[in-house]
Amino acid sequence: MDTPDQLSLRRYGASPGSHSHDHFQILLGLSGALELEVEGRGVRVATGGGCVIAPGDRHDFESAGGSLCLVLDSAHPGWAQCASSQLTTALPTDALPLAHYLASALQQGRPLAQTHGPALLLEAWLAGSTPHTSLHRSTRQRTID
């Protein structure tokens, strides 16, 4: 993918047929449910769910009742850490409100959402998949006198 990461809002309905991409495709469910087949495995992205499709994975989709997804097309190698054999997951805690904000910002034409949104989504997704470290035990903290 020669172009920069691209965020978009997409409404899904009937299937256009099986296809693949040369980049990661990240789907974040905002409303409805999207049924996918990725490399022969069934995947469902419902509201609050997400899916990372790896480059080259053949996939097809359908949404009988319609669905709205925030979609990121990205060649960033960091998404490889998020792609898994499970494919679909509940969005990490910080990713869902971020996805809603980015969707609103895209609709309102806020350019910084397109510029910085892809990196923020990756950061939020990765943060949700790694153990959290407590800030309360920092060596820099001391009691207040």
Give names to the regions the model predicted.
Residues 1-86:
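N-terminal regulatory/effector-sensing and dimerization cores
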Residues 66-68, 76-116:
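General nucleic-acid-binding
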Residues 92-99, 103, 113-145:
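A short, Lys/Arg-enriched amphipathic alpha-helix from helix-turn-helix/homeodomain DNA-binding modules
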